């Protein structure tokens, strides 16, 4: 059974589309991942849906990241996704526009360390369309 999405009550959440993540993920170009997400963003913009870009980046001293998570421990060792560095920037092909929110998370779940929940309430959203490189976490 197909479910209709009401664009007035839906938001698009592109996750973790930062330069360091893209450089570390094989097959991006071959699978046309960024091109497909860019098309999805344009469709959402055409429907005037809220678009909330979620990034994952931390301080250079890593004091704001969880130490108990294996994924984040690996990040610390890699010296990547540091706030203010080119690697933490969203790729230009899927970059936010000035009227779109960018919310940075410092843990795997964007609801735990951000104001994402409040933003969705503010937009009166009841449906999320999630896309990105690592959406299985």
Where are these regions (language model features)?
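Active-site acidic carboxylates
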Residues: 1-97, 101
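Internal catalytic-core helix/loop-beta-alpha segment
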Residues: 84-133
């Amino acid at each position: 059974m197909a479910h209709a999405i009401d664009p007035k009550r839906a938001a698009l959440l592109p996750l973790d589309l930062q330069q360091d993540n893209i450089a570390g993920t094989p097959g991006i170009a071959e699978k046309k991942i960024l091109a497909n997400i860019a098309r999805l963003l344009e469709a959402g913009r055409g429907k005037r849906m809220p678009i909330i870009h979620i990034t994952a980046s931390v301080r250079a001293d890593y004091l704001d990241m969880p130490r108990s998570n294996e994924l984040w421990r690996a990040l610390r060792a890699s010296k990547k996704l540091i706030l203010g560095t080119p690697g933490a920037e969203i790729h230009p092909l899927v970059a936010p526009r000035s009227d779109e929110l960018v919310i940075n998370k410092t843990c795997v779940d964007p609801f735990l360390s951000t104001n994402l929940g409040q933003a969705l309430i503010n937009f009166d959203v009841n449906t999320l369309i999630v896309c990105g490189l690592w959406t299985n976490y």
